Amino acid sequence: SLMRQESLFDSAITSSAGARGLMQLMPATASEVAANMGYPPNFTLDDLYLPVVNIKLGARYLARQINYLGGDMMAAMAGYNGGPGNAAIWQELSRGDPDLFVECIRFDESRQYVIRIYENFEIYRKIYELP
């Protein structure tokens, strides 16, 4: 759902802000995550257009968001788009209520992002007959 929202599965896309690839990683974020992982050894920003590299780095960055935000997937998605510090504030304001959390997101882009990811998730759940 996140990848669909970020790039519509286009591995060659670059956003107007400079985010690259399937999971739309910003170069500075990707470089920092790659350095922390030691992956790949001769990482360049052009590697962000390689699905295997982009997904691995994006998944690691998302895992950091999930960990930082106490396992709260909705907050992690908001943090992926709007920054982890902002997501932590919205999480605190909403006191665990997912509907209130969405309303606490102060950036319209991030609010719509979270809503669309969950809509996509429900569609995929039905398509693939997942519980």
Locations of regions flagged by a protein language model:
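Catalytic glycan-binding domains that act on GlcNAc-containing polysaccharides
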Residues: 1-131
